[in-house]
Amino acid sequence: MVQVAVLVDFPAVAADSEAAVRREVGNMTLINEQQQIKVQKAIEQAESNTDAELVTVLAGQSDDYYFIPTMWAALIALVTPALLLQTNLWLSQTDLLWIQLIEFVVLTVVFRWQPLKLALVPKQVKFARASLVAKQQFLAQGLHHTQAETGMLIFVSEAEHYVEILADRGINKLVADDAWSNIVNHLLGQIKAGNTEAGLTGAINACGELLADKVPATHNKDELPNHLVII
């Protein structure tokens, strides 16, 4: 399933940042060093024709979700006595308490296995955490401090299968949301096919063409680093 959301205003912490398009991503593998260089060159090429500043961030995971194993283990341990009482087993209250305790400890450990833990996290929670990290990265990379408010972020979070594009108000007032949606859809298709580097460079090139038309270069500038950021 692909989830879509468009934000016209961020919370106060990111009040200078506007316009977000996000999607769920299928299976993905982070890119290697040579591919990172290709992405960097794509960013440099895109920025050569626009006053916009483009940053691309890849996150392995947006949250540790430490509470998830404990929450599920506690929930299952809580309902276990009620289920056991429906059987013909002769169990004392002490027996039930020991079963609950052992079950809670074992399940807490088992549920910390990364693939299982991520499967237990509700999709809405994963998307919310990834979206929060995207906004934090927008601020952390200084995209809200560009001279003409023309910062833009392409954010990908691998574990959450999540992609989001954020653009500052200087870009947002000139570019329709549908334009970002088309770019993200193409990026999603490439990543789901296992072509992460091709997807990123394609998205960067498409953003570069769009920004060159809407926010053309008027002076030599390079306010922010062009390398791919991996967190």
Regions found by a protein language model. Give the residues of each.
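Short, charged cytosolic
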Residues: 29-54
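Transmembrane alpha-helices and immediately adjacent membrane-cytoplasm interface residues
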Residues: 85-120
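Acidic, Ser/Thr-rich low-complexity segments on the non-lumenal side of membrane proteins
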Residues: 135-167
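Residue-level signature of catalytic and energy-coupling elements of molecular machines
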Residues: 17, 51, 154, 203
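Membrane-cytosol interface motif
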Residues: 123-141
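Select subsegments of transmembrane alpha-helices in polytopic membrane proteins
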Residues: 65-76
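Periodic low-complexity repeat segments enriched in small/acidic residues
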Residues: 1-27
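A membrane-cytosol interface segment of integral membrane proteins
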Residues: 31, 169-228
